[in-house]
């Protein structure tokens, strides 16, 4: 099963990549594809909408935080 999950990047300031990753992998493990970017400090978000919709159509489940980010961006699924 695939999940859309946040993967932490950045050492001192939290910056996250939104990735499609196998549910059995670690948070920092190998991802299937990078589908977005989230910076909570500067409140910036970049989403690759076609890639996100592709994974959602294939049955991927977003985590709670990713679900909130997608809802805020207006992605309907």
Swiss-Prot record:
- Domain of life of the native organism: Eukaryota
Q: Which GO terms describe its biological process?
A: mitochondrial translation
GO cellular component: a single term: mitochondrion
**The entry's keywords:** Chloroplast, Plastid, Ribonucleoprotein, Ribosomal protein
Q: Where in the cell is it found?
A: Plastid, Chloroplast
Name one molecular function that GO assigns to this entry: structural constituent of ribosome
- Cite the PROSITE patterns for this sequence: RIBOSOMAL_S16 (PS00732)
Question: What PANTHER family does the entry give?
Answer: 30S RIBOSOMAL PROTEIN S16, SMALL RIBOSOMAL SUBUNIT PROTEIN BS16M
Q: Which family does it belong to?
A: Belongs to the bacterial ribosomal protein bS16 family.
This protein is called what?
Answer: Small ribosomal subunit protein bS16c
